[in-house]
Amino acid sequence: MDQQNFYKSKNKLIKLFKADGRWLRIPENKGECVVLSDLHNDGRTLDFIIDTYLVNSKDAKIVICGDYGDRSPSSWLSKPTATLDSLLKLKLKYPDRIFMLMGNHDLNPSKYQNFMPCEFWHSLSEHDEGFYTEILESLPVVTTFENGVIMTHGVLPSSAIFDDFDLASIALMESLWSDYTEDVPVKTDSIRKQKGLDDFKRSMDSFNCNVLIKGHNPYAPLRMFDNKCVTLQTTRVFEGVCGRHIAIVDLGKPVSDVNDIKLVDLGILHGK
């Protein structure tokens, strides 16, 4: 797809993303879904995942839990939008197999919460800034499967009842920016607020789910809360901090805890 046709696809992409509001429900109960998070412009890893799990399967799905730009791996010599562009084009080609959630790096810092690093946003022309802002503002925040798995970027909203497209909502902003922790007491005095076990249980009960798959925090344990929460980082940027993982969910199998999900270490499978 050439650049002009890509620009013309903006309204189609927004319509696809807005179809289910901020809470995307995926009703399928067969096949597999690969879940990843925090690609941060790691196109090499994305290409490997697409080639391995999407192209070679007729019904496999992929969910990405946000943070598509910034922190580009030094060995991925490409423009800051490269990985996001690839995903958006894949969404157009496979609208029922590629699902993208919103991360905190995906909201324009000139309109919402400022943050660093944000080389993705700083690299854009005025036209491109408007193009990506409108598309990324339309992304869902939460995705659920019927087998008890829920996905988000940071933490879950405290209630399953939240405004579909109100980006000024405190609940939505806290979902993108906050972290879960098993530490006590819980810190609440920064943009990256901490949520504890009670918050986690309250949200999981509200959404009627058993296991959360999320991203956002490379310093979080891979498994938390008695095997009810998984934190993924898929980019090579944090390889030495937390490893590089994806989760594979069997959509036809009830999931009661993390042991019912396959966690794959891409550092071992894919190498550097």
Each predicted region: which residue ranges?
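Active-site neighborhood of phospho(di)ester-bond hydrolases with catalytic His/Asp-centered motifs
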Residues: 35-37, 62-66, 99-104, 151-152, ...
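Binuclear metal-dependent phosphoesterase catalytic core
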Residues: 229-272
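N-terminal active-site segment of His-dependent metallophosphoesterases
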Residues: 1-81
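Active-site environment of divalent metal-dependent phosphoester hydrolases
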Residues: 40-44, 70-74, 105-112, 157-159, ...
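Short beta-strand scaffold segments in enzyme catalytic cores
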Residues: 140-144, 222-224, 243-250
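A generic secondary-structure signal
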Residues: 48-53, 86-90, 202-203
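Active-site neighborhood of divalent metal-dependent phosphoester bond hydrolases
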Residues: 30-32, 58-61, 68-151, 157-158, ...
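Active-site-proximal loop/helix segment associated with metal-binding centers of metalloenzymes
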Residues: 3, 7-10, 116-128, 134, ...
